[in-house]
Amino acid sequence: MGKYNRILALDLGIKTCGFAISDQNWKISYPLEQFNFNRYDFASVISRIAFWMKEYPISILVLGYPLTLAGKISPRTKMVEYFADLVKKNYEIKVVFQDERLTTKQAQTFLLDLGISFKKRQKVIDKLAAQIILERFLNTKKG
């Protein structure tokens, strides 16, 4: 059952954004990049989304939704909601939120287990977290 269009997932931070993408059948996730930008310069992240939309046919944008460990809304949650509104104003694309609790911790543990140095981890942690966010989303679509 092919879906054909891909899903792009983001782990949005204050000055970095991890990107990951699905295959066309929505079964496999791949880390794309860790994009660095000036603090709160979300326009540059919007432009980077445009770049990936030109590279791949994308039908859904999944944003990591940073709830607190207790499942409550936080200032970072509001930031991601604001960013989602910016995306919707710029593109006709379905935007969905995916709980991202502990994804960075999970990515960090994985990289530590591989013996990756701190410096190298900092260069890939967000794109790996985006991949985990996307995997979680894809798992909700299996049935």
UniProtKB/Swiss-Prot annotation:
The keyword Nuclease applies. It is found in: Cytoplasm. Disulfide bonds: none annotated. Transmembrane segments: none annotated. One of its GO terms (biological process) is rRNA 5'-end processing. SUPFAM superfamilies: Ribonuclease H-like. Its EC number is 3.1.-.-. Keywords: Cytoplasm, Hydrolase, Nuclease, Ribosome biogenesis. Could be a nuclease involved in processing of the 5'-end of pre-16S rRNA. Belongs to the YqgF nuclease family. This is Putative pre-16S rRNA nuclease. It comes from Mesomycoplasma hyopneumoniae (strain 7448) (Mycoplasma hyopneumoniae).
